[in-house]
UniProtKB/Swiss-Prot annotation:
Keywords assigned by UniProt, alphabetized: Cell cycle, Cell division, Cell shape, Cell wall biogenesis/degradation, Cytoplasm, Glycosidase, Hydrolase, Peptidoglycan synthesis
Name of the protein described by the UniProt record: Beta-hexosaminidase
Reactions listed under catalytic activity: Hydrolysis of terminal non-reducing N-acetyl-D-hexosamine residues in N-acetyl-beta-D-hexosaminides
Domain of life of the source: Bacteria
PROSITE patterns in UniProt: GLYCOSYL_HYDROL_F3
Family to which the UniProt record says this protein belongs: Belongs to the glycosyl hydrolase 3 family. NagZ subfamily.
Residues under site feature: Important for catalytic activity: D189
Organism of this sequence: Bordetella avium (strain 197N)
Active-site residues from the entry: H191, D262
High-level lineage: Bacteria, Pseudomonadati, Pseudomonadota, Betaproteobacteria, Burkholderiales
Residues holding substrate: D73, R81, R148, K178, H179
Record GO terms (molecular function): beta-N-acetylhexosaminidase activity
The EC number(s) this enzyme carries: 3.2.1.52
A Pfam cross-reference name: Glyco_hydro_3
Amino acid sequence: MSKSRKPSLLPPGPVMVDVAGGQLTEQEKQRLRHPLVGGVILFARNFENRAQLTALTQDIHAARGEPLLIAVDHEGGRVQRFREDGFTALPAMRTLGEVWDRDPLAAMQLATQTGYVLAAELRACGVDMSFTPVLDLDYGVSKVIGNRAFHADPRVVAMLARALVQGLALTGMAACGKHFPGHGYVEADSHHEIPVDTRTLADILKDDAAPYGWLGDQILPSVMPAHVIYPEVDSQPAGFSRRWVSEILRGQLGYDGVVFSDDLTMEGASVAGDILARAQAALSAGCDMVLVCNRPDLADDLLERLSFTPPAVDRIRRLMPAYAAPDWDSLQADSRYQHARRIQSQIISG
């Protein structure tokens, strides 16, 4: 690229957007250059094959002088956006919890190897982070969480999450714990409804929120709050609540990492008003970056109307991998990767 055409060195902004397909359109390139944009979240619709995905992430990173953060929901089980052309079929996190009940040491090993395979494959294709692990407790009632949760015991959840994050870290990938302070106790799906959890703050902190306090920002460089209302604590969903984000998560639990909002287009976010009101509420509560997914019209509306609020730039930058990852062919020949896949296969089949 010639010097005159080099993208401007904008710091990351507080809005994460998405793209429609497998290649960037000119309109999307323009959107990514907006100073309020700080990241891009990918979905299954953005994947045709590994070569195409790698080209797409290269184009996204090249859109700005300081590359945007590229993220994806790639947890394993039913929430795994890329499943073909060599990507490993990752187990649902409940599988790790079931292994724990038989053999805790084997479960810890499986969690680390799963995290490593997950992250190594994503990074080989240019994806910077996955919004994982899910720290919600498995109460057996939540429709949207289900087998995405490790276990019902918060101590087991914390141990398995820590092991999974260790695997991510082996590749240079940051983790994101979700959905603070806990989405597992309510049946409603916040994508389509507004869940309400009527428990007391003491009960939530003792169980659901405990892993966040135990792990902290050294293990979880980022956290995503739930679009769930806890009326005994605040009338607003956690992601829009200064009580939850600033006072409890950051103040009481001492958390100093990045806080992402969940998708502002979800039904659970509708209580805060229009897209601008939702973003303002999340940022005012203490979130560092807000997600606007599947509605480019709302993303553009927000980018046009949101007054610039300097984001926690240093926090956000810490989520970017510090070093380059091996490409796919090099990864396939890597002995650590081969070992991790063998461990996964042996433990799950056994």
